[in-house]
Amino acid sequence: MTRDELHAAAMALPGAHMDVQWGDDHVYKVAGKMFAATDGAYSNLSFKATDIAFEALTEAGRGRPAPYMARAKWVVLDDLAAQDAAEVADWVRTAH
């Protein structure tokens, strides 16, 4: 998934906006709550996953528990460019 594809998918969701926080992180929010975040280079993506997606992604090694956020079932995908755009867009929609 490219930077533009991620940004378009996240911003297409109702009420979504993006803030730059913590230096250069791009944080996608709705109603003041985060649902996805990426570094400024869009090299990785963190998002709130369902219980099933969290288990599947982390157990298969496709993602890892997000630092400080794993208890809330956040996942990090370390290589966003290698991810299928449609699949990531679906995870972002679900996180929203």
Predicted regions and their residues:
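Charge-dense, helix-prone N-terminal extensions
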Residues: 1-96
